[in-house]
């Protein structure tokens, strides 16, 4: 079973997966300004290649990714025993897919265009979870 325990002395690390560099860098800047370390990826595949062994507080994933979709990534994570909290970013037209993803283990979804406050509140809630709830 994959582990996702956050070391108690480590700053929270959030993964952001978005194919749009403006959106990806905007989320990184927003979270970084608020004391969160961020690793960014342009695809699910690049995340899977680079993230082996990283301790993530949560993942923020665009639902529509090139190659493997956000939903496919979620399924892959869950089937491998990794229950890192996943927040999906979904356009209004993708809300029904995002709701289906919640049934498959997504923690939440945020509709795009999103407000910074909504993202910060969700990340804050996830990185402050007790260790037992945040572990894989």
Question: What is the predicted function of each stretch?
Answer:
Residues 61-63, 90:
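Active-site residues of response regulator receiver
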Residues 94-96, 110, 114-124:
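C-terminal output helix
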Residues 40-58:
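Acidic, metal-coordinating helix/loop segments flanking the phosphotransfer/catalytic sites
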């Amino acid at each position: 079973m994959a582990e996702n325990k956050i070391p108690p002395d480590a700053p929270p690390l959030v993964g952001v997966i978005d194919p749009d560099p403006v959106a990806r860098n905007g989320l990184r800047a927003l979270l970084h300004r608020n004391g969160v370390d961020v690793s960014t990826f342009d695809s699910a595949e690049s995340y899977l290649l680079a993230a082996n062994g990283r301790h993530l507080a949560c993942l923020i994933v665009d639902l529509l990714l090139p190659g493997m979709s956000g939903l496919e990534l979620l399924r892959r994570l869950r089937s491998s025993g990794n229950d890192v909290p996943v927040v999906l970013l979904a356009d209004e037209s993708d809300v029904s897919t995002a709701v289906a993803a919640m049934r498959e283990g997504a923690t939440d979804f945020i509709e795009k265009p999103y407000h910074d406050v909504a993202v910060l509140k969700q990340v804050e809630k996830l990185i402050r979870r007790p260790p037992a709830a945040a572990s894989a």
